[in-house]
């Protein structure tokens, strides 16, 4: 009997050691994996919208299709139609892939934006506009629609911060700094990659390997807040009346600084 109890105790002790070793090893693997990722955290699991706040009443228009976040610009939410993370961030670098699926709406009022952020004028002082097949979305930073890194098809290119560029109360140097240095977008339907860095009140945007915004000052930007994917566009009598957010997103990662 004593021998049997000793054997049972020994087996239990060995089992305990094996479990402890497994837990310890698993912890090491997790740590090493985290270290290998360099501190990057995934904001999208490729399967569902866990970690995101879907607008109330959306009706399934923000959805996951084939491993990407897909939006058809038709959210039925009565209020905000944007998609937000359920976590707030302060200083960070955000990486994500995005693409414009199609551009069924032709925007007849697209201005030609100059390097200082102003619009090109004709001899009468009127803004020169052109017609462009357009789609419009963007990345909201720190919970602020004004601090939006734009996604669209305008000739100036994606990456600009529209809310600051168009704010006439901002100093000229601020408005110029949030205007893209170059057009770096790929063709409509192709994937693009943003790397967006926010540190204090300063923003840098790299689009497809090109720095389009470098250390732009965003006076008054919130100290922290969630990341948002923008809704834009609406229909009238079944036809698009403004540039729709016909966009997709994938490979969304963030590293806090």
Predicted regions and their residues:
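N-terminal secretory signal peptides that target proteins for export/translocation
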Residues: 1-10
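Bacterial N-terminal signal peptides
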Residues: 12-25
């Amino acid at each position: 009997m004593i021998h049997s109890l000793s054997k049972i105790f020994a087996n239990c002790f060995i089992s305990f050691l094996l479990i402890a070793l497994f837990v310890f090893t698993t912890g090491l693997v997790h740590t090493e994996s985290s270290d290998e990722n360099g501190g990057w955290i995934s904001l999208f699991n490729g399967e569902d919208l866990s970690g995101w706040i879907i607008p109330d009443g959306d009706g399934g228009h923000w959805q996951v299709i084939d491993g990407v976040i897909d939006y058809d610009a038709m959210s039925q939410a009565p209020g905000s139609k944007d998609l937000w993370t359920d976590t707030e961030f302060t200083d960070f670098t955000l990486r994500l892939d995005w693409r414009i699926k199609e551009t069924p709406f032709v925007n007849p009022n697209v201005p030609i934006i100059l390097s200082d952020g102003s619009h090109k004028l004709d001899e009468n002082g009127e803004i020169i506009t052109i017609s462009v097949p357009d789609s419009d979305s963007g990345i909201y930073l720190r919970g602020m629609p004004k601090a939006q890194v734009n996604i669209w098809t305008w000739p100036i290119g994606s990456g600009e911060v529209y809310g600051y560029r168009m704010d006439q109360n901002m100093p000229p140097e601020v408005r110029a700094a949030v205007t893209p240095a170059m057009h770096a977008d790929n063709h409509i339907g192709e994937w693009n990659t943003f790397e967006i860095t926010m540190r204090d009140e300063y923003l840098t945007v790299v689009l497809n390997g090109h720095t389009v915004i470098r250390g732009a000052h965003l006076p008054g930007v919130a100290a922290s807040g969630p990341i948002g994917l923008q809704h834009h566009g609406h229909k009238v009598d079944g036809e698009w009346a403004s540039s729709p957010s016909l966009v997709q997103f994938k490979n969304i990662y963030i590293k806090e600084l």
